[in-house]
Design a protein with these regions (language model features):
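Active-site-proximal alpha/beta segments of enzymes that process anionic O-linked groups
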Residues: 182-248, 253-399, 474, 495, ...
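A long, amphipathic alpha-helix that forms part
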Residues: 204, 396-442
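Histidine-centered active-site microenvironments of extracellular/periplasmic hydrolases
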Residues: 263-268, 434, 438-481
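Phosphate/oxyanion-binding loops and surfaces in catalytic or ligand/nucleic-acid-binding neighborhoods
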Residues: 102, 130, 313, 436, ...
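Active-site rim elements
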Residues: 196-200, 408-423, 430-431, 462-466, ...
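Hydrophobic, well-ordered secondary-structure elements that form the walls
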Residues: 426, 447, 476-477, 498, ...
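A structural motif corresponding to the C-terminal end of an alpha-helix
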Residues: 306-315, 425-438, 480
């Protein structure tokens, strides 16, 4: 706080003629109006379309919604509008809101708790890939200039009693207006929220940033305590010993419709997997389009991690990852790729040497290996997800600003190159298992798919609770085994079924799990190595 005060003082000394004095209540109101109007004006058309009915746009409901959002924002800001917090909080909101507005306008993303948590966990390299020259005007007009105006302000406060009373009166006023607005137009606003799959909520800046941050903080803390308690409450044991290595490989953003194995006709994207006999190609669906929330759908159930259950049953368990599994492997820890052979840059194939080393130590019994192919088909710079030699489909999209700098053809070329590389990595993992001679079951699936400008949508990241478009929901599920297995025929397979299937393959009995979702029949006997 003191550092910020000194920075503001120095800034005012450099630009003395631009200094201005303003009361804390006036500053709060002006700041809230300026930030709210500037950010949402850029997205107004997309918001307004959800308030249309047979007679045109329902402006009364739209105005009521926007007014309620503004009043709630101002009311929340007043809670922090104190002598030592008002400027830091205003600057923080300005920076976050400006960046959020850019991604909402340019990519149509929705800002909720999952997006906030993703932003916190995003790799530095991925952050750099999202930056482009298109962002400069947004940063200048929505961040730099407003922050300068905040630093130049000499905010005055009356006595504590008087300024608290003034804040309280304004707080009660704006909250009352918000409540009245929502009450009067409740039905119309509710319909717009449902019709838009809550888009009107997740795109209203900075209300979305504030609510998303609060929910993200809450969700980050609560599950940890719940998991710690549940981890202590259950037991797991192997009911029938055997010899089997189960390898679960989790991909990233690779959608099923671009796999030629599944009938993709644009080009052949799976030349290596097509040569492997005995593949089981299953249609699976994801229900979460954010990696942070999608991975637990595969690796967690009843707030207990799969690796925790398997390791507690006495099965040796390891996790080899490119990027991270977001704390879904804490029971045994992650082993991350390192010393990669592409000039220090790591790709998904760099996980494979770890797998080969592990298989070389296998003698007998059960073993569980989780592989994370975290590069996968993640945008926006798809060409960064594979070595240069896999850039077979040209011309690629070479810019992070996909929506403005690349054609649809370039976008598909780049994305299909990632699928070509996924094909190589998955086939090499199967090859490593075959050459090792171990009895194995190999399972590959992606955490979610990806939108490539279908209906104007790009990438992924739909908030939890909102139905996914097909291109983000439909994912590949590929199974290969060196031992006899039977797979239940289903129209579609769910990600949580993988959890049950792994436990079933190891004959693990654990109190909290009934294994009803298992789609791989447990072999009656597993031949020793």
């Amino acid at each position: 706080m003191q550092a910020l005060d000194r920075a503001g003082y120095s800034f005012r000394m450099v630009f003395p003629r631009l200094r201005y004095q303003i009361s804390h209540t006036t500053f709060s109101a002006v700041f809230a109006v300026a930030l709210y109007v500037a950010c949402n004006a850029l997205n107004f058309a997309k918001l307004a379309r959800w308030f249309q009915d047979a007679g045109g746009t329902d402006y009364s409901a739209l105005v009521a919604y926007l007014l309620a959002g503004f009043c709630l924002f101002l009311g929340f800001f007043l809670l922090f509008a104190h002598r030592y917090t008002i400027k830091p909080f205003a600057i923080l909101l300005t920076v976050c809101s400006g960046i959020a507005t850019y991604f909402i306008v340019k990519y149509g993303v929705a800002i909720d708790s999952s997006m906030i948590r993703n932003a916190v966990h995003t790799d530095v390299t991925e952050v750099g890939q999202l930056l482009s020259a298109q962002m400069i005007p947004y940063i200048l007009l929505l961040v730099i200039l407003p922050v300068a105006a905040i630093l130049l302000a000499d905010i005055t406060f009356e006595s504590p009693r008087r300024y608290l009373w003034a804040s309280l009166k304004l707080f009660v006023l704006v909250v009352s207006i918000a409540a009245a607005s929502l009450y009067i137009e409740y039905q119309a606003i509710f319909r717009a929220g449902n019709a838009s799959n809550k888009y009107i909520v997740y795109s209203l800046v900075p209300v979305n940033v504030i609510s998303g941050s609060i929910n993200a903080a809450s969700k980050a803390v609560k599950p940890w305590f719940k998991k710690q308690q549940k981890d202590m409450e259950f037991s797991a044991q192997v009911s029938r010993p055997g010899n089997l290595v189960v390898v679960l490989a989790v991909g990233e953003s690779s959608r099923r419709r671009n796999f030629s194995l599944y009938g993709y006709e644009r080009r052949k994207t799976n030349p290596e997997l097509e040569k492997i006999a005995g593949l089981h190609l299953l249609d699976a669906v994801a229900t979460r389009a954010s990696t942070l929330y999608a991975l637990p759908k595969i690796l967690e159930k009843n707030d207990i991690m799969l690796t925790t259950v398997v390791s507690r049953a006495g099965v040796p368990t390891v996790c080899y990852v490119n990027y991270t599994l977001y704390d879904n492997c804490v029971a045994v820890g992650e082993t991350k790729v390192s010393n990669c052979g592409h000039g220090g840059k790591c790709f998904d194939e760099d996980v494979l040497p770890l797998l080969r080393q592990d298989l070389a130590t296998y003698k007998s019994g059960y073993r569980f290996v989780v592989l994370h192919f975290g590069g996968g088909s993640h945008g926006p710079l798809y060409r960064e997800r594979h070595p240069p030699e896999f850039e077979q489909f040209k011309p690629p999209c070479a810019d992070a600003d996909v929506a403005n700098k690349c054609s649809v053809e370039q976008l598909y070329n780049s994305y299909d190159n990632t699928i070509l590389y996924v094909d190589h990595v998955v086939s090499q993992a199967i090859d490593a298992l075959d050459k090792s001679g171990v009895p194995y079951v190999f399972i590959y699936l992606s955490d979610h798919g990806e939108s490539l400008l279908e209906d104007g949508k790009l990438f992924h990241g739909v908030p939890p609770g909102v139905s996914l478009p097909a291109e983000q929901a439909d994912i590949p599920l590929i199974v290969k085994a060196s031992v006899p297995i039977a797979i239940d025929k289903r129209a579609v397979y769910q990600q949580p079924d993988v959890f049950d299937s792994v436990l079933n393959l190891f004959s693990i009995e654990a109190g909290p799990f009934d294994l009803e979702g298992s789609f791989i029949a447990r072999p009656e006997t597993v031949d020793p190595r």
